Amino acid sequence: MSALIDFYAKHSRLVDQIGINAILALSLSVSLQAGQLALAQAAFMGIAAYVSTILALNAHWPLLATIVVAVLVSTVVAAILAYPVRRLRGVFLAIATIGFGEIVRVIANNLKITGGAEGISGIPNDATTPVIYGALALVALVLFLLSKTKFALAVALVREDEYAARGVGIDVGAIRTLSLALGGAIAGLGGALYAHASFFITPTDFGFARMEQILVWCVVGGVTSPVGAVLGAALLSVLPEAIRFLADYREISNGVILLAVILFAPGGLSSLWRARRRTAARRVTRAAT
C-alpha cells in the first residue's frame, strides 16, 4: 500500500491524465463503432472546457454544475453538426469535421472571453483523481448498458451495411446523429475535467494535434473496441513518461507503436486478446472431443 501511495505522490498528474485520456478515447470510439470517421472530438472537448472554465471563474459555479452544462452544450453542438455532415462518409466526413474543429480553434483564438491565444489561467483545480475516475466509471457503465440494447445492434448494422440497415427499418440518420451526439457528450465530459485538472487552457490544447492523438489511441487499441480505446489511451499516456530518458527521441514513441500495430495487428491490441481467446476456446473444444 505504501508503494502505491508513493507512486501516486510522484505520478498523480499522469494518473489523472490517463483517466481523462481514456474518456476522450471512448468518445471517439462511440463514433467509430457507428462507422463514422468523425474527427471533431477535440473541438467538443474544447467547447466544454471553455464553457466549464468560464462558468467556474465568472459565475463561480461549483464543479458539478459547470460539468453538466458543459456536457449539455457539447452534446447539442455535436447533434447540430451531425445534420450538415449526415451525407458524408469516410475521408470526406473526416475532412469536414476536422474543418469544424479548426473553426472552433480559430474562434477561441480570437474571442476575449476565451482569453484569445493566451488562454485562461487560474482555473480551480477541482477535478481530483476520484472525480476523474468516477466519471470514467460512469461513462464505462453507460456504454456497457447501451451495448446490451437494440441501439447497439442498430449501430453495428449501420457500420457494416447501411443499405441492409435501411432495409430492416433502421433510421440510419438518427443512429448516426445519436452516435455523434453521444461521442460529443463524452468528449465534453473529458474536456471539462481536463480544464479543471489543469491550471490553464489555450486554443492549441484543442487543435488538430489533440484530435490526431485521440485517433491514434483508438487505432492502437482497436477502432471498434471501447476496452481497446482505453487500453490504447493508457499505453500511449504512460509510454512517453516511461522512456523519458530518451529525451527528444521519446516523442516518436507513439508513431513507432502505431506503425507496429498497423503492420502486425491491424485490428488493434484488443484484436490480439480476442484472437487469443478464440484459440483457447478451440483448444478446449478439441480436448472435449
Give residue ranges: language-model regions.
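Loop-to-helix entry region at the N-terminal start of transmembrane alpha-helices
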Residues: 9-17, 122-142, 200-201, 250-254
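Residue-level recognition of pore/gate-forming positions within transmembrane alpha-helices
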Residues: 17, 21, 45-50, 70-75, ...
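Transmembrane helix-bundle core of multi-pass membrane transporters
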Residues: 88-152, 156, 175, 286-288
